[in-house]
Structures are given as structure tokens and as C-alpha cells.
Amino acid sequence: MNAPQENQASQDDADVLIIGAGPVGLTLANTLGMAGVRVIVAEKLPRIIDYPRAIGIDDESLRTLQAAGLSDQVQAHITPHHWMRFYTASGQCFASIEPRTDEYGWSRRNAFIQPQVDDILYRGLQRFDQVQVLLGHELHSFSQDDAGITATLKDADGVERTLRAKYLVASDGGNSLVRRMLNVAFEGRTKPNQWIVVDVRNDPLGTPHIDMHCDPQRPYVSAALPHGIRRFEFMVMPGETEEQLSRPENLAQLMRKVVADPDKVDYIRKRVYTHNARLAAQFRVDRILLAGDAAHIMPVWQGQGYNSGMRDASNLAWKLAMVVKGEARSDLLDSYEQERRDHARSMIHLSEVAGDIFAPESHTAAKVRDTVMLALNAVPPVKQYFAEMRFKPMPRYEQGVVLHHTGTGNQGVRTPFAGLLDRSGNTPLGRLLGLMAEKKESLVGRLVHGLETAASSPVGRMFIQPRVATANGHSGLLDDFVGLNFCILAWGTDPSYGMDEEALNFWQRLGARFIRAMPAGQLLHPTPTRDGVLTVGDEQGRLKDWFSAQGKSVVFVRPDRFVAALASPQEVSAVTRQMARVLHSPLEA
């Protein structure tokens, strides 16, 4: 069987050209670098941006940085378990988001200072001889053909440089030149109000979390950040301008809402931001792919702009690596848009809902919000639902590189207050919510839609990351034993035992890891396995609990840690053939 076309020799300067050295471009370059892919990153600025933007990084993003081999360095610049609390104008807390679980190996909510993490990503590229960064080089033009893309860059002196690559990834921000030159629509809206953001040193408050003060007179945010930094954000009210609020006397007046003496505050910088909610109509145009803010932008209220971009990088990296190495046909890249676009839309909706709750458009709406939220907060299951951040739409891929028909067949798990949300007409509240939820673009519609029953099958969802141990005494998080590879993991049995030669050769050719999990105590007397199979002990009992909830004992995990399929030990060869099909990868070398 002939190898896919992308495996043919060429005179390309790189396999992948990345436009934009923000967090998405740098993360993608690091991950591709670890996979041995030749990468050029072009950034129009002379240096990576050094002013803070995002302040929240979630467990999924930290897991991505772990996969890139940089999590140890990043931990020095994060505050884990960073809760978010919402207060009425009178100072009464009406909601608290404080998830305390770590199913993916990391705290679910974390504060960080983005430039410090961006610098780690930038310096991380020095590990790879085949990765090059061109700072001060702006994209001037590009074209594509059946074999690749040709791009012309200009440096600060106007000197042009032409590059050839197999694929181009545009991570060049919300004002993406690539997206505009492709004439890809960027649908959505821009909020009319702006926010002035003030960062200060030597935290004048010292409280450890993020407080959202929902005062309709002027909503504001107070967020504790690592290294004694604090961020304040104040809404720019109608009739005010950035120039007015930036004057020392007016800024001091704003700061008196939060500190006793503004003159004693150690200011770092202040900037004004406008909140946008937009989604690209396409994430892929042949050999060009959009990622991060070039593909989607959203309000900051749940910190998901940065994290959505990191999800893009994680999803796209392993697929690009397979394609440029000739392990899969280019059709695999269609799954990037299939898997990421709908979830990006969901995160935009969540961010808009959070913004509507935080800063409603009228005093009357604020009073209704306070009354409703305080009432809901008095119901323990509802309070727990928000505290554990279960309202956050977790990625679940319905199509793409997933095999849903091999799942457990379970029909779903109901939310703690699913009865309240029953739209069948069995309760008055259910009938009311049902009517309001018909308009999913409304506040209530989006909220109800996000709280409804979710399917329980793990296929298409991120796999857990517990701590495991090996017989030789090594202990750590599961991903550290897998690397940037596929993983076939089984509970209590050798996952390769039931595989025929063709299936086994397929996974070995892709570098997949075979792992057998068992109770940690059984590591003292493990039964034999086939060569190359790693046996790990389930130190926390979480793998046992996970498999107990499934009807199958073998899980196929993708390099981005999402569950691709479930199987019984006797189905692994058949499932492998199905996996080869959805991966657009030949079974035979």
C-alpha cells in the first residue's frame, strides 16, 4: 500500500509554518517539536508580548503544558485552587466557584501571569534543533497548492523572505491577517462597554482569590495573582472615555473603591479592553488552519479565551504530526474543525452568560439576578453544582477521531437538579424554563441549555490522569509514562493480548504505549505480559473507579488525552481497524 502523499520528500523549509508567537503558536510549536516536526514560527513583533493579558489557566491547559515537558517550570508561576466569588452591591456573596477535584492531574482553576508562562514556552523551543523562531517578521502574502504553502515574510527593514511549508497555522490573534486574506467570516458581536484593567505590585489587599463585585453602579473585579501582583478591572460606564479614566485623579477615584489610599499603590500598568464574542466560520481552508484568537474570541469572565486556544493547540498538534510524517492522510485534519468549533462556540456562550450575570444591562436586571442567585445558592445541590464548576461545558467530541458505538450504552447522568430543568411540562418551573430555553441566545436559554443532562459515555471526553506507580519504584502522573503518544490501557490485563499481528503492528508503528493497570499492591507479584507492555499500580484507586463505571475494560486514548474508543479484550483488533479508518491511516506500512 502506498504511503500518504505528505510522506514524499520535498524541498520545504518546514513541515509547519506558524504565524504568531502568542501562547497558542508557542504551545503548538513546542508540541510539534517534541514530535520531531520541522517548524518555523514567524512573529511580526520584535519580541514576545510582555504585558499581562490572561490571568486564569485551567487543568486542561496545564495538562497540555505537561505534555510539552514544561509543567515543572510553569508551576513556579501559578496559584492553584483559585476560587471565584460573586458579590452583590451590598457585599453579599451569591455564588462561589471553587472546584476542589483534580481528575486531570491538576487544580481545575489556577491564577497565573501570562508573560512568565509565555517566556517559558518561548525558551522551551531552544530544545529543538528543527524549530526556528523568526521575530520581527511579518506575513506579507501567502498562497497554497496541492503540495504545500508558499509565504512571503518581511522584516523590520522591509527585506522579504519566501518560505515553503506543507501547512500553515494562523495563530495571529483576533485581527488575524491570515483569516482576513482567506475571507473567512468572523461572526459574532462586540460589547459596547469597555473595561480598564489596572495591575499593581505589592498586593494592597492580600486576599487569595478573585472577587467579582456585581455593583450595577460600576461592576469591578479584584484578582490575586502570583508573586504579589493584583489585578483590578473596572467597567467604563456610558459617557466615560479611556482618556478620562486614565487621568491620575480619576484613576485614584476608581481605586478608592478597593483601597484606602490610592497614592500608596505600586502601579505596574493600565490598559483598556473591549470584550468580543466571535467565531470563525471555518477553522480549515485546505492547508491553512486557524487556531486561538484567530479562530474564536470571547469575553474574559470565565478565563476561557486563553484555555480555548490551548485546546486548539493540543487537538491540532498530534494530527499535524501524523499527517506530515506520512502516518495519516490529510483528511485527518478535517476532524480539527469538527471537534473544536462547536466547543469553542459553547465556551463563547458560557463567557457571555457569565458576563450577563456579572454586569447586567440594567439595575432591574441586577436586582432580579441577586434575588434568583441568592435563592438558588440556598439549595445545597445547586450551590454544589456551581461550586464544582459543573456548568462549564467540557469538550465531548461527537464526531472526528472517536468511536461512540463501542461505548457503554449508558443513557446519561442527570444533574443534581435535573428535575427542576425538566422541560416535559411536569412542573410549573419546568414549563417556564422550557419556554425560555427555546431561545438559546437568551441568558436563561444558554444557562438552561448548559445545565441539561449530559451523556455519560467517556468516549470523546478527556481521560482522567491519576497518580500511578511502577514495580521499579517510579511514581508520577499517568501522562508522564505515556508521552505524546497513543495509549491503549487495560484494567487487569495485557491490552495487546487479544490483538492480531496486523493490529499490533499498526499501533507499534504509531509508537503507541500499551499499559496494564492494577491495584498498586499487586505490583509485587505481577503476571507476565508481552514485551513493551508497561504495568502500573493504581495508587489512588481512580483507574479502578473509572473502569468500574464502564462496560469495557480497554480504553484507547489519543495523544491529546481524549478517549477515542472503548473495547473488551476480545474486541481490540476489530476496534483497531475502526480506529485506522477514522484516523485515515493505513493498517499496513
Curated annotation (Swiss-Prot):
This is 3-(3-hydroxy-phenyl)propionate/3-hydroxycinnamic acid hydroxylase. Its cofactor is FAD. It catalyses: 3-(3-hydroxyphenyl)propanoate + NADH + O2 + H(+) = 3-(2,3-dihydroxyphenyl)propanoate + NAD(+) + H2O; (2E)-3-(3-hydroxyphenyl)prop-2-enoate + NADH + O2 + H(+) = (2E)-3-(2,3-dihydroxyphenyl)prop-2-enoate + NAD(+) + H2O. Catalyzes the insertion of one atom of molecular oxygen into position 2 of the phenyl ring of 3-(3-hydroxyphenyl)propionate (3-HPP) and hydroxycinnamic acid (3HCI). It comes from the Bacteria. Gene3D superfamilies: 3.30.70.2450, FAD/NAD(P)-binding domain (3.50.50.60). HAMAP family: MhpA. Keywords: Aromatic hydrocarbons catabolism, FAD, Flavoprotein, NAD, Oxidoreductase. The gene is mhpA. GO terms for biological process: 3-(3-hydroxy)phenylpropionate catabolic process; 3-phenylpropionate catabolic process. SUPFAM superfamilies: FAD/NAD(P)-binding domain (SSF51905).
